[in-house]
UniProtKB/Swiss-Prot annotation:
<feature type="compositionally biased region" description="Basic and acidic residues">
    <location>
        <begin position="502"/>
        <end position="514"/>
    </location>
</feature>
<keyword id="KW-0597">Phosphoprotein</keyword>
<keyword id="KW-0694">RNA-binding</keyword>
<feature type="binding site">
    <location>
        <begin position="53"/>
        <end position="60"/>
    </location>
    <ligand>
        <name>ATP</name>
    </ligand>
</feature>
<feature type="compositionally biased region" description="Basic residues">
    <location>
        <begin position="515"/>
        <end position="538"/>
    </location>
</feature>
<keyword id="KW-0698">rRNA processing</keyword>
<keyword id="KW-0539">Nucleus</keyword>
<dbReference type="GO" id="GO:0016887">
    <property type="term" value="F:ATP hydrolysis activity"/>
</dbReference>
<dbReference type="InterPro" id="IPR025313">
    <property type="entry name" value="SPB4-like_CTE"/>
</dbReference>
<dbReference type="GO" id="GO:0005730">
    <property type="term" value="C:nucleolus"/>
</dbReference>
<dbReference type="InterPro" id="IPR027417">
    <property type="entry name" value="P-loop_NTPase"/>
</dbReference>
<feature type="short sequence motif" description="Q motif">
    <location>
        <begin position="9"/>
        <end position="37"/>
    </location>
</feature>
<protein>
    <recommendedName>
        <fullName>ATP-dependent RNA helicase DDX55</fullName>
        <ecNumber>3.6.4.13</ecNumber>
    </recommendedName>
</protein>
<feature type="region of interest" description="Disordered">
    <location>
        <begin position="576"/>
        <end position="601"/>
    </location>
</feature>
<keyword id="KW-0699">rRNA-binding</keyword>
<comment type="similarity">
    <text>Belongs to the DEAD box helicase family. DDX55/SPB4 subfamily.</text>
</comment>
<keyword id="KW-0067">ATP-binding</keyword>
């Protein structure tokens, strides 16, 4: 394990290019952070590095600067289509951020070109841009980069372009694996030359990360950077200048407490984390209405094309609120975030650390607050032990305004709000059921009535988790929710059209059902007629056909004899004798009838 020091950039054992030093001064970074002073010299001496450091410790510059220096020291100049470095990162937002930082360092060196490959963009346009402008340094998300390696239709042969690769960086490696990119990473590694320098950067060390180190790095130097002033025996994973708080309140008090807090901190910059995309959509809309005089924006993983624009816009704000999911929890560097508010605790403990790390970055101060239900209070000690992350209690604010009736009124006035509330509640319950810390976050202990009031629901939704449960403490509104219209006239017109189509469909089905019932009655009438016809024929036979009657009698006698024989009541000899007697009787009768007929003639 390397000894970690820090100092000025000029104190590095391998000198940096004067233009690189100039950019560092312009950006306001006169000194290195511990992870930078530990990593940069090793990277520049052709070592593979696996660096673990707390979030917000300056890991981005720890690989951007070595990339720049390594490419500058290459004797042969790069052609525009030759790739010298690849940086892989788990999310679009982080990729955009890294590409922005990188652009400061490539600007003084026009011989280098860089390109950003992320989802949410047209891949054909990415290929065209690469062929036109080149990309000596690629910043990409795993899925898009894998797609580019496999893409042949547009005439791109990326496998040939990466033969000149000098450096590969895997940023937020633990998150890359958590998000299911392991297969994509392994596919990408197969295309890359073995003779390269590889850097793996992570805030947490897991077994999966260790496996990736063994697969992708050659004799790596392992670097673990602790917070200054933290005891060696400790493994604190949050910045030392971060103040961590918690507030215990009931589910139907949380929203009022959140709004009260935001109204009292309008001049500051906040990230508000929710557990699901649906919760972001619902509460983001509610906060826009109830917290006036402050810019409120929403971002989550299901946004395909708006995310980058929203992210870049929020970064530029001096104050504002970004309502988000964990898509914003890792590696994202948003300038001067004052508070990280966790309305819902994250699904795992490591995500808690990463959420908090969006503030108090690179030596700046910052604060974080997590809202907990009374049944979740043991999570505080769990974080202190598991993540070495102590929390201080923040008392409930008294005399807060009750905003839930206003939220209900919003739902009654606009079907969009009503539907978003229902979806948010369902998604929250489903996410809660899958919580990693299920000994603390137990679904069976959840107060669903209080939770539904906290979501300002008009009625309880139908879902498997609530089947068979009674909620005497929850009073649904005395309104037929099917009649609630959309405020958007176009959406309401579409809804009414769908309702009419549904009514026509139901009418058609009902008519078909009635027709089936009528057909069934007709069948009964037909059967009745058949029965009547048979009775008539029988009567006619009895009246006009003595021969047929005798034949029937003979058949019945033969049947009776056969039954007696099978049951053992008569012998075989008696059975045959009976048959002969029956036949003679019929013959005599027939002969008599024929003679009578001849006499009549």
């Amino acid at each position: 394990m390397e000894h970690v020091t820090e100092g000025s950039w000029e104190s590095l054992p391998v000198p940096l290019h004067p233009k690189v030093l100039s950019v560092l001064r312009e950006l306001g970074f006169p000194y290195m952070t511990p992870v930078q002073s530990a990593t940069i010299p090793l990277f520049m001496k052709n070592k593979d590095v696996a660096a673990e450091a707390v979030t917000g410790s300056g890991k981005t510059l720890a690989f951007v600067i070595p990339i720049e220096e390594i490419l500058l020291r290459r004797e042969e100049k790069f052609k525009k289509s030759q790739v010298g470095a690849i940086i892989i990162t788990p999310t679009r937002e982080l990729a955009v951020q890294i590409e922005e930082v990188l652009s400061h360092f490539t600007k003084p060196f026009p011989q280098f070109s860089q390109i950003l490959w992320i989802g949410g963009r047209n891949p054909g346009e990415d290929v065209a841009r690469f062929k036109e402008l080149g990309g000596n340094i690629i910043v990409a998300t795993p899925g898009r980069l894998e797609d580019m390696f496999r893409r042949k239709a547009e005439g791109l042969d990326l496998a040939s372009c990466v033969r000149s690769l000098e450096v590969l960086v895997l940023d937020e490696a633990d998150r890359l694996l958590d998000m299911g990119f392991e297969t994509s990473i392994n596919t990408i590694l197969e295309f890359l030359p073995k003779q390269r320098r590889t850097g793996l950067f992570s805030a947490t060390q897991t077994q999966e990360v260790e496996n990736l180190v063994r697969a992708g790095l050659r004799n790596p130097v392992r670097i673990s950077v602790k917070e200054k002033g933290v005891a060696a025996s400790s493994t604190q994973k949050t910045p030392s200048r971060l103040e961590n708080h918690y507030m215990v309140c009931k589910a139907d008090e949380k929203f009022n407490q959140l709004v009260h807090f935001l109204r009292n901190h309008k001049q500051e910059k906040h990230l508000v984390f929710f557990s699901t995309c649906a919760c972001v959509e619902y509460y983001g809309k509610a906060l826009e209405t109830l917290v006036k005089g402050v810019k409120i924006m929403c971002i989550h993983g299901k946004m395909k094309y708006k995310r980058n624009k929203i992210f870049m816009e929020f970064r530029k704000l001096q104050s504002g609120i970004l309502v988000c999911t964990d898509v914003m929890a890792r590696g994202i560097d948003i300038p001067e975030v004052n508070w990280v508010l966790q309305y819902d605790p994250p699904s795992n403990a490591s995500a808690f650390v990463h959420r908090c790390g969006r503030t108090a970055r690179i030596g700046h101060g910052g604060s974080a607050l997590v809202f907990l239900l009374p049944m979740e209070e043991s999570y505080i000690s769990f974080l202190a032990i598991n993540q070495k992350c102590p929390l201080q209690e923040m008392k409930l604010q008294k005399n807060t305004a009750d905003l839930l009736p206003k939220l209900k009124a919003m739902a009654l006035g606009d079907r969009a709000v009503f539907e978003k509330g229902m979806k948010a509640f369902v998604s929250y319950v489903q996410a809660y059921a899958k919580h990693e810390c299920n000994l603390i976050f137990r679904l069976k202990d959840l107060d669903f009535a209080s939770l539904a009031r906290g979501f300002a629901l008009l009625r309880m939704p139908k879902m498997p988790e609530l089947r068979g449960k009674q909620f005497p403490d929850f009073v649904p509104v005395d309104v037929n929710t099917d009649t609630i219209p959309f405020k958007d006239k176009i959406r309401e017109k579409q809804r009414q059209k769908q309702l009419l189509e549904q009514q026509r469909k139901e009418k058609t089905e009902n008519d078909g059902r009635r027709k089936f019932i009528k057909n069934k009655a007709w069948s009964k009438q037909k059967a009745k007629k058949e029965k009547k016809k048979k009775l008539t024929e029988k009567r006619k036979r009895e009246e006009g056909s003595d021969v047929e009657d005798e034949d029937m009698e003979e058949l019945l006698n033969d049947t009776r004899l056969l039954k007696k024989f099978k049951k053992g009541k008569i012998t075989e000899e008696e059975f045959e004798k009976g048959l002969l007697t029956s036949g003679k009787r019929s013959t005599n009768k027939a002969d008599l009838e024929i003679s009578d007929l001849e006499d009549d003639c």
